[in-house]
Amino acid sequence: MEITDVRIRKIDSEGKMKAVVSVTFDNEFVVHDIKVIESQNGLFIAMPSRKAPDGEFRDIAHPINAETRSKIQTAILDKYESICAGSTETEGNN
């Protein structure tokens, strides 16, 4: 499965969330609402989640192995860093 598009919407506020991202796979399937979060250890991604009735947050969609998570995170963070350098609000691969 190939990542064919990454669209980033930067969040210009003081919080830890820096961007909301949509990733398209094989020009056929898109996952919205992936978040770019800043922590003490640097940037990471958080997959889209929903609050369950018990108060826990559960991922709606997520990679099932570390290799795929790394591939998605690298694509998102590379794109995020490139648009931050160019200060563009929203950008995709198109």
From Swiss-Prot:
<keyword id="KW-0132">Cell division</keyword>
<dbReference type="GO" id="GO:0030435">
    <property type="term" value="P:sporulation resulting in formation of a cellular spore"/>
</dbReference>
<comment type="similarity">
    <text>Belongs to the SpoVG family.</text>
</comment>
<keyword id="KW-0131">Cell cycle</keyword>
<dbReference type="GO" id="GO:0000917">
    <property type="term" value="P:division septum assembly"/>
</dbReference>
<protein>
    <recommendedName>
        <fullName>Putative septation protein SpoVG</fullName>
    </recommendedName>
</protein>
<dbReference type="InterPro" id="IPR036751">
    <property type="entry name" value="SpoVG_sf"/>
</dbReference>
<dbReference type="Pfam" id="PF04026">
    <property type="entry name" value="SpoVG"/>
</dbReference>
<comment type="function">
    <text>Could be involved in septation.</text>
</comment>
<dbReference type="InterPro" id="IPR007170">
    <property type="entry name" value="SpoVG"/>
</dbReference>
<keyword id="KW-0717">Septation</keyword>
